[in-house]
Amino acid sequence: MRVAVDAMGGDNAPVVEVEGAVAAAGEFGIPVTLVGDTDRVNQELAKYNCKGLDITVKHASEVVGMHDSASDAVRKKKDSSIRVAFDLVKNDEAVAVVSAGNSGATMAAGMFVLKRLKGIDRPAIAQIFPTLRGKTLVLDVGGNVDCKPLHLVQFAIMGEVYARFVMGVDNPRIGLLSNGEEESKGNDLTRETSALLKNTSLDYFGYVEGRDIFNGIVDVVVCDGFVGNVVLKLSEGLAEAVGKMLKDEIKQSLLSKIGYLLSRKAFVNFKKKVDYSEYGGAPLLGIDGVGMICHGGSNAKAIKNAIRFAHEYAQKGVNQRMAEKLQENYPLYMQQLEMLKVQAAG
């Protein structure tokens, strides 16, 4: 099962993409196709001993930049590295795409080339967060800034399946992000979504607050892409700031430095737990295929792990399970949605 990597996406392309691909092929035995400028990609590959590694290169003459519109990836730049990568999946030459490029363009290309899963109106970008009890999946973290209750219910179903079959959670609990735990809190979007979620087969916990993401009281947290992206960027900034503050404090005295040396293993383990590169990338859920969106500043380790997770996602047939779960729940939440419409009209 081959993974296609957008070798020209991201701040450090194609350097980190090539290094990450070589590492994934070497450590995990995953076949990889690097998509991009053949000359530049081969120049980077020449730095490594790739003997015995299943790595191929597919030429793409165009690149979608970070400031290009999402539509450019689909309509204007048909030979862009991200578009060609998804074409490989469509033509059964790969099972997944990994890209650290323009996330909007990646999402648009995935939807245009591979289409959406049956029962999905809008795909969502999901992100794993480290918690006090393990891990929590949050979605949407940036794919859709304006959502309807129906979209959030679909996000919850996709998140439940991903948590169960990729994260290994036996019975995932679903929480809806709000400004308080009480049912009286929230806005029209969360209140209507909550009513729909209660009418599904999911283990719906109810409202959760922002702090609960890191407490780990639920396994999946659902929100619209506007709120989710704020949560994501806030957590990234906080982790970076805390790390710098800690370093500054350690430098203040000899005693602090000695304390750090004695506790170094704990610090290393903590850093590993909050390091985004450990999780690779954010899965694009809801397209009829596998797409992994990486941070624009991803290092080789992040690319390597994104390839691993994308390969695992495809291996486990998660999309088929999502389609089945969506079909199972469709009549349940649609019945409730019709009731809410009648109440609103009356």
From Swiss-Prot:
One annotated GO molecular function: phosphate:acyl-[acyl carrier protein] acyltransferase activity
Enzymatic reactions: a fatty acyl-[ACP] + phosphate = an acyl phosphate + holo-[ACP]
Pathways per UniProt: Lipid metabolism; phospholipid metabolism
GO BP field: fatty acid biosynthetic process; phospholipid biosynthetic process
EC number: 2.3.1.274
Keywords: Cytoplasm, Lipid biosynthesis, Lipid metabolism, Phospholipid biosynthesis, Phospholipid metabolism, Transferase
Database matches in HAMAP family: PlsX (MF_00019)
Subunit note: Homodimer. Probably interacts with PlsY.
Protein name: Phosphate acyltransferase
Lineage, uppermost ranks: Bacteria, Pseudomonadati, Thermodesulfobacteriota, Desulfuromonadia, Geobacterales
